[in-house]
Amino acid sequence: MYHSELFQQYGTSYGMRPPHALAPTYPTAGGHHEAYRYPELDVPGQRFDGLFPALDPSQRILGAPPLTPLSLPPGPALGFGQLQPPCETPQLPGNVKMNLENKELWKQFHSIGTEMIITKSGRRMFPQCKVSVTGLEPDGKYLLLADIVPIDNSRYKWQEDRWEPSGRAEPRLPERVYIHPDSPAPGSHWMKQPISFHKIKLTNNTLDQMGHIILHSMHKYQPRFHIVRAQDVFSRRWGGCSSFTFPETLFLTVTAYQNEKITQLKIQTNPFAKGFREDGMKSKRDRSTRVKRKVIEPEEEEEEFQPEGECKRPLYTGPCDSTLSEELDIGRGLGIPLPSPDCSFHPITPPSRTPPSTQTPNPSLTANQEQGAALEMSSQTPETFLQAAGQSYPEQPPVRGGSLYPCPTDGHGAQNQRHPLSVQRLPQAFQGLQESLGNSPGEYKIYGGDVGCGGDFAPPSCAVAPSVRPSEERLPRGYSMNSELRFPHFLPNGGSKIGLQFSGAQLQRLYNGGGWM
């Protein structure tokens, strides 16, 4: 109510009237939550999947408008165990036919009782559904669909070598439709060859998000196939629909095969189950043995063609695996043959990028290999690496002032230095050996040179001072002048180890008569 003098444009005021009395059939305020409040909107069996309403006449959304003439008219609500009638109007021409291609295979399983495995991740069907279509218009666009529906209202169990009903079926799950990947396609495409639905997967996961068909275990189901004339999958205007079923395709869903005859028949007829046959590799151990045999046999064939003059690295399988090529010739470019490498081995000469050819039956040895074969080093003792100075390392021209690389020592240490050979800070195992060599007629020296270290604060590594022989000015035959020369970080023997840590560039300048730096 408003004041008429202040709001004259609204006219005279009207008094408040009491509300109209409610109809006697209208529920009271306390019963508004009851289901009979809106009886005209109470639709049994409501579902909200309206993608293909023509395939399911019972699909009615709450408050939705009535179905259009292009789809099926609404029918009575279907309970459990009642087959849904196929789409009736509009129909495709009567000459449209569908045949089951692998009908004989389905009959073999149907005579025993077909069982289909369902898993949480989804399992494909075997036998697969393969059909052929005739009577379509060559230029018309068609969709091919498939769905699986229960045939009764019972749950089954395997008892006394047969399937028997064991109670009421589980509540019906939301039905899903499988659309053939070639849809839509012209009729000529569908009729030129059989159509396979082998990609259909069955699952018992009610929360599946992969689009698999959800089924209950221990229930009987029947696949259905539909031909729909439409321009695209989401078209709401269909020109016609025909549905087909084959009684041979009826099956029971299980999580594990119950009938032993079904198991044997699937092993015999399924090409992907050959591993379970009597002549197949059934066990995991047998399969692993077969894989190992395939890996070992090619290696044995390669070893037959391996030349004798080449050194092949062993195949490692531990944490110290080598990343170099298996056929790396690790003895190339060296004056001596190398022992078998271990985890700390580093080749002195960088490996060749081209592996040795295995086609040459008798490869010619290089000069370094000939020299290594002549040395015939058979043991890995400290004496093995004590080479003659004139044969192992090149001699340098005379240098004034004595040794090329004297260690920095004080005056007292210089007076106590012995020539031509002095060893300080060497392990005790080598000191006795070095003294015995120093007292013998001087032909042998450690690595062909003097070893000297200075002071208590000197680095642990020792400098090598090669012997000076003016009479010999050329390098020994077969020695590789490689700027990337590296000494191994160890001597592979049972005694103490000496580390010679010099770069290739420093040794190169040493051999050429230059300075240390």
Curated annotation (Swiss-Prot):
SMART domains per record: TBOX (SM00425)
Pfam families: T-box
DNA-binding region, residue intervals: 105-278
Record-linked InterPro entries: p53-like_TF_DNA-bd_sf (IPR008967), T-box_DNA-bd (IPR046360), T-box_sf (IPR036960), TF_T-box (IPR001699), TF_T-box_CS (IPR018186)
Main location: nucleus
GO cellular component, one term: transcription repressor complex
Subcellular location: Nucleus
Compositionally biased intervals (Low complexity): 355-366
Disordered, as annotated region: 276-318, 333-418
Key words, A-Z: Activator, Developmental protein, DNA-binding, Nucleus, Transcription, Transcription regulation, Wnt signaling pathway
Biased composition (Polar residues): 367-394
Composition-biased stretches (Basic and acidic residues): 276-297
Alphabetical list of SUPFAM superfamilies matching this protein: p53-like transcription factors
Alphabetical GO biological process terms: anterior/posterior pattern specification; embryonic pattern specification; mesoderm formation; muscle organ development; positive regulation of DNA-templated transcription; positive regulation of transcription by RNA polymerase II; positive regulation of Wnt signaling pathway; post-anal tail morphogenesis
GO molecular function, one term: DNA-binding transcription factor activity
Biased composition range(s): Acidic residues: 298-307
Subunit structure: Interacts with ripply2.2/bowline. Associates with tle4 in the presence of ripply2.2/bowline.
Function, as annotated: Transcriptional activator. Plays a role in ventral mesoderm specification and acts together with nog during muscle differentiation. Mediates posterior pattern formation of the embryo, including specification of posterior mesoderm, via activation of the Wnt and Fgf signaling pathways.
Protein's UniProt name: T-box transcription factor TBX6
Annotated organism of origin: Xenopus tropicalis
Upper lineage: Eukaryota, Metazoa, Chordata, Craniata, Vertebrata
Gene label: tbx6
